[in-house]
Amino acid sequence: MDVALEFLDPLILDKAYAWLLPSEPNVPDPTSRWDRDNVYRQVISILVLTQLGATSLYLFFSALSYYFVFDRRLEYHPRFLPNQVRQEIKSSLSAIPFINILTLPWFLAEVRGKSMLYRSVSDYGWPWLVVSSILYMAFNDIGIYWIHRLEHHPSVYKYIHKPHHKWIVPTPWAALAFHPLDGYVQSLPYQSVSLSPVAAILRAIPLTINSVFVFICPMQRHLYMVLFAAVQIWTILIHDGDMISGHWTEKFINSPAHHTLHHMYFTVNYGQYFTWADAYFGSHRAPEPALDPLHDALKVMRAKGLVDEQGNPIKKPKGE
């Protein structure tokens, strides 16, 4: 977030705040009463940027995935809800501002220099850049695995995570269709990497590993920004319903096929990027062609006379 503000302050925000809160009215080229280090200005800037950024990423990549990857025949599945796409979009867009408010303290701590993010690659060298990327992915994967799995505990599930499982056969538009607290809690492993040890220890989430991690893993700030954005995109892509199976990468990567099975069977494939945590803790279920929800969708389409036995569209004569 500090990278974004450093870019946008001289480009747009300085002029915007000078217009809204001029230090001296009726003078040419006024400055703002709130300088760049003003905490109120930083709070407003962060909230505006996270709202615009999260919404733009969601709408752009969900649309790409929905129109170019998602198999629209899945919308005929018996468990696909009436007006589901509209509901998914509405749920996602309504959750984003609340998730942004909840994550505000961590972004604010980062902007105000309370993080372990560093500026130059030369500060720690290229080898650490690679190592920190691997550690970041591994840490987030195990953190989200256990947060996600705990959210499926009966005492928690119905209050926080159930809204996301309303979509048995999700589309990419369901990627952010969370209860806001659900989205926030699952984002904590990403945020914790950038917090200083003191700030991390004060966090409410009772996961000691998050506090320990920041003692050993500084991260280059541009790398963090890229990985953080990539995580949001990945969250969308794993909801595309693609049940490709038999590829050697499925042994290691928590693919859209794995996440499709999670939505269908609830207690499998809790991981975010990789399958190792599910495999080790006994919750892994490998994708199989027979488990593809498209089979049930095609049954409905055949009954309606929309496709033949091979799943090919039936062309009706003109005028019918």
From Swiss-Prot:
Which lineage? Eukaryota, Fungi, Dikarya, Ascomycota, Pezizomycotina
**Can you say what this protein is called?**
Delta(7)-sterol 5(6)-desaturase erg3C
Family note = Belongs to the sterol desaturase family.
The listed locations are:
Endoplasmic reticulum membrane
Q: Where is this motif: Histidine box-2?
A: 161-165
Domain of life, per the record? Eukaryota
The gene designation is erg3C
Please list the coiled coil stretches.
Answer: none
GO CC, one annotated term:
endoplasmic reticulum membrane
